[in-house]
Amino acid sequence: PNCKDPDGWVDAMNEVFPKYEINTPERIASFIAQCGHESGGWRVFSENLNYSAKALDAIFGKYFKRAARDSEPYHRQPEKIANVVYANRMSNGDTDSGDGWKYRGRGPIQLTGKANYSAFASDMDVDVVDNPDKVSEDKEVALMSAIWYWNKNGLNRYADSGDIKTMTKRINGGYIGLEDRIHHWKEALHMLGSDVSEHESDDEFVEEPSPEDIGVLRKGMKSVGVVMMQEALGITADGDFGP
């Protein structure tokens, strides 16, 4: 319901899905539901790095410390933030190279880092190393980037068995938004003419996990996952897992 151009996305899916074995109601519904959640309802295809200085300290503090930089000058400066937090990782160059911003997260399942852009370009024969904006602006390329990740992680087998919980863990690293993913998966299955009840024999996988189960989080960690866990628990969300 939030998608800005549903007809355009349907056309792109009809073109791309058959080429990469997203070719059954179960696989199509799973892909649409998972990517829909990850992209805010098929609306957001470029990583939002518009963080306050406080949020930067909570979420990316270790990268600023590693770069010997104070977060305050980076307050609400997305390009500068990307160039610090993604520097010297994932085959990106240093802060001054601009690779962090150039290869920031894009697509329905955020393709991030020069190494991943290069691997995707090589495997799928599409030029995104020199033209990374294709991943967020060209619908077919955007879908291909998500399918590349999907197939690398063997997600069709979970789609075939209706194991949305494990699929979510492989994509998200935890179970954030599981209920929403399941809701849209059921909707998509219904629209594709598949009997949802056939996929509900094992109730365990549709159970919303407790906040303690969100991701692999340990004391001392500072991350987005910690922020989300704290919000789920109703406590101050400072991104710092500790007393």
Which residue stretches match the model-derived regions?
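Peptidoglycan-targeting cell-wall enzymes and recognition modules
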Residues: 1-8, 12, 36-148
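Second-shell loop/turn segments in exported
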Residues: 1-4, 17-21, 30, 71, ...
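Acidic helix/loop microenvironments that form the catalytic cleft of cell-wall polysaccharide enzymes
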Residues: 35-38, 159-177, 243
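Low-complexity, Gly/Ser/Thr/Pro-rich intrinsically disordered linker/tail segments
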Residues: 170-214, 231-232
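Short acidic, glycine/serine/threonine-rich helix-capping segments at coil-helix boundaries
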Residues: 211-243
